[in-house]
Amino acid sequence: MSSFHRYFKKCEEFALCAEVSDGNVVEVEDASERYTLYQIVVKGSGRMGKIFENDYIVGDVNGVYFADLKEYLGHHTVFESFEPVHMYGFNTLDLNQDWDGKLIEGSFQGDDKSWLICFKGNPTINGKELRVMDYAKLENKHYDVQLNDAIVGVFTKL
């Protein structure tokens, strides 16, 4: 029998969720709970779509998969994993509040409307080593980044 575990953390201005399964799992999410703007898959593959529709997002992950899921807000969705999977969701707290999201590839200029989140690994940012699920509100300054093969996202409130 396959197992599926879901975790949720409400942060100051957003929420994070994480899903971990050993594969071959189907998960359904009700429209009233669908606040995920971005999905970050760090392990595994699967597909996701609106229930009873033919169009799916298929994620075949050899590295990392970052998906904009805004079109799924307010819709019933279904996710099927093809193999063991570990993924995160960046969620808005208010469906009327939009965010821009991206994975960083190196050093960058921050701003005070943004948050940084570590999804995998142990990057060093401005001399501080981060762990998985560490997050911080950014300031209007330069951030020196050594990724060390980590996966780090920056999300900006629009």
Annotated model-derived regions:
Residues 1-158:
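Jelly-roll (double-stranded beta-helix
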